[in-house]
């Protein structure tokens, strides 16, 4: 390789900081175009938390063209014949008033694919498998981006191995920040955020209950349930199915000072 004007050899054309759904989606998009890229992701495995479960038709269109749609649908944890829509109840989940919420099937004629629902960790696993099929994509799992900088020749990302002492610098034409709201790439790029503090904390619990499944048979074909109440001051209590019959998640506000021990 010929390097001119003091330019240092590059490891890839693009370094992607963050290997969640956004980072992996970008890696697939670039990899399918034979653009060499490196994904730096701090977690060796997806977090086993059933968040981000609703996938819109537009998201599934992307998955289709990335060659991962069928793998994502196969990872669904609720039977195909059971509904994946939701409802909102007022006051209490067992009250007299509720209405259907996010009826995505109503806009199905405007899209190429159906929507889907599954835990984010299952979806991320499918994306990781697809990335592994692309020769132009290198993944560095278990590595954290410590710094991002640039010069006249491109971008540099200083990374650190989380389960060891190794450090290195990855060089590319471009660095892309896909590392969430506390993005190192965003901060180093001087991109600011406008934030507003609030005094409410939320808890996300995962639990098992077959009794709750039987209790909610009054809402056939529903997979997630919101409860609105004046005392919550605009926040909500949010139940959802992880599978059909036993496993659930619960998202709700908790008093200030709440910890995992109390």
State where each predicted segment sits:
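A short, basic/flexible loop-to-alpha-helix module at the beginning of a structural domain
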Residues: 1-11
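Core beta-strand elements of the Rossmann-like FAD/NAD(P) dinucleotide-binding domain
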Residues: 10-12, 164-174
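Active-site-adjacent segment of FAD-dependent monooxygenases/related oxidoreductases
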Residues: 48-130, 229-232, 240-241
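A conserved short coil-to-beta-strand element within the FAD-binding core of flavoproteins
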Residues: 141-156
């Amino acid at each position: 390789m010929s390097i001119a004007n003091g330019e240092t050899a590059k490891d890839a054309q693009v370094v992607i900081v963050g290997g969640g759904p956004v980072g992996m989606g970008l890696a697939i998009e670039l990899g399918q175009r034979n653009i060499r890229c490196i994904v730096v992701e701090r977690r060796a495995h997806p977090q086993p938390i059933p968040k981000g479960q609703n996938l819109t038709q537009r998201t599934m269109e992307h998955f289709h063209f990335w060659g991962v749609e069928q793998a994502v649908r196969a990872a669904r944890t609720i039977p195909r014949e059971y509904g994946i829509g939701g409802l909102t109840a007022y006051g209490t989940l067992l009250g007299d008033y509720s209405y259907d919420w996010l009826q995505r099937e109503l806009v199905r004629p405007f899209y190429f694919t159906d929507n889907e629902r599954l835990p984010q960790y299952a979806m991320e696993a499918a994306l990781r498998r697809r990335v592994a099929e692309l020769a132009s994509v290198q993944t560095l799992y278990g590595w954290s981006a410590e710094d991002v900088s640039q010069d006249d020749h491109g971008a540099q990302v200083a990374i650190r191995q989380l389960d060891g002492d190794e450090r290195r610098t990855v060089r590319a034409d471009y660095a892309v920040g896909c590392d969430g709201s506390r993005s190192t790439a965003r901060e180093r790029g001087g991109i600011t955020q406008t934030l507003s503090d609030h005094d409410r904390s939320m808890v996300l619990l995962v639990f098992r209950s077959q009794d709750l499944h039987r209790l909610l048979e009054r809402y056939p074909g529903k997979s997630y349930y919101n409860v609105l109440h004046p005392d919550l001051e605009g926040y909500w209590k949010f139940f959802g199915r992880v599978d059909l019959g036993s496993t659930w998640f619960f998202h709700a506000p908790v008093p200030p000072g709440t910890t995992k021990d109390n």
